[in-house]
Amino acid sequence: MATERHYSPLDRLLLQADTAMRTLLPFSGQPTRPSPAIVQPDADLDEQQARHIAGLMRINHTGEVCAQALYQGQALTAKLPEVRKAMEHAAEEEVDHLAWCEQRIRQLNSHPSVLNPLFYGMSFGIGALAGLVSDKVSLGFVAATEHQVCKHLDEHLEQLPHEDEKSRAILEQMRIDEEQHAESALEAGGYRFPAPVRFGMSLLAKVMTKSTYRI
């Protein structure tokens, strides 16, 4: 029977650095699942449509960068091994989303946000602090964040042109995954944040969406 490997603090820091590089460098993320867009037909989009869709996908890509950083920060400071493993597993699934969004952005002749390193650092710090408070708060933060992501995905799905089936397929699968992450975090004992905290998180999310739509 295989034994679980135990990492030293230095090992974990090196793994965090490697994850950050793979998250932020172009074409670095290797998805474990093929993009849902592969089987969808190409759409005849005009320049304005393509630019708008690229902006939406750039927002979603940065959202996944933030989620990846959040999970990594929480995994670094989580107190219970099972919580740490849950964070690391969720982060692995976010790699798929990162790769899918970047692929679609490139197909639309655009680029990920130049602000990604800033948002990664901020999200990592928030995740690490949440993990230091307690695993219950950490898991609750995951649930609240993923619910916020689901709201953004719903809004973006409404804005997509009907003919853009590639982007739609990606966002619909992401929506399914993110909802599962939120429910799993709550089932694991995550704290349900009160409305004022969720409102504050939504304001921060708006800063991210407004700034990354174009850059």
From Swiss-Prot:
This protein's record includes keyword Hydrolase: no
The enzyme's E.C. designation: 1.14.99.60
Binding residues annotated for Fe cation 1, in chain numbering: 64, 94, 97, 178
Chain positions recorded as Fe cation 2 binding sites: 94, 146, 178, 181
Enzymatic class: oxidoreductase
Molecular-function annotations in GO: 3-demethoxyubiquinol 3-hydroxylase activity; metal ion binding
Top-rank lineage group of the source organism: Bacteria
Pfam hit, one: COQ7
InterPro entries xref list: COQ7_proteobact, Ferritin-like, Ferritin-like_SF, Ubq_synth_Coq7
Family label: Belongs to the COQ7 family.
Name of the featured protein: 3-demethoxyubiquinol 3-hydroxylase
Gene label: coq7
